[in-house]
């Protein structure tokens, strides 16, 4: 079969790109806020059944997830800048295909990285629920 694609210069592609940029920007800003809040007010282990080491393990993974979102946001901004989608200095040509491709691959790699982090967080949470009977609905604290 054929892989479904959206033509490069179509209005649908522009809509999808703008949606991607808007959602990515929102995730970047929320993650930046959440990581800052995390540093100011670190989470406390309120569950008496869960050992401190297990609690710290999951929260290090969760903090790493926010850092991955922030890194992906930075690589997304650089990717859009070197593709000419955004300009920080009017009239300056910032299009650089080599940097655009390199940062684009990095942007994609961060996506795969945070998918794996989410999987590990969920698996460790399930493991802790089974082993320690420490149930928590707050999966991404």
Locations of the language-model features?
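Membrane-embedded alpha-helical bundles that constitute the cytochrome b-like, heme-associated redox core
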Residues: 1-141
């Amino acid at each position: 079969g054929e892989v479904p694609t959206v033509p490069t210069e179509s209005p649908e592609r522009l809509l999808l790109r703008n949606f991607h940029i808007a959602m990515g920007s929102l995730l970047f800003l929320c993650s930046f806020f959440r990581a800052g809040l995390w540093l100011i007010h670190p989470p406390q282990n309120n569950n008496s059944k869960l050992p401190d080491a297990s609690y710290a393990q999951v929260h290090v993974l969760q903090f790493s997830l926010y850092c991955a979102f922030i890194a992906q946001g930075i690589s997304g901004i650089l990717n859009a800048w070197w593709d000419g989608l955004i300009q920080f200095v009017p009239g300056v040509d910032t299009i650089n295909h080599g940097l655009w491709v390199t940062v684009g691959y990095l942007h994609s790699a961060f996506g795969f990285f945070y998918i794996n982090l989410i999987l590990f967080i969920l698996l460790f949470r399930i493991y802790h629920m089974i082993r320690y009977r420490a149930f928590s609905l707050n999966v991404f604290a």
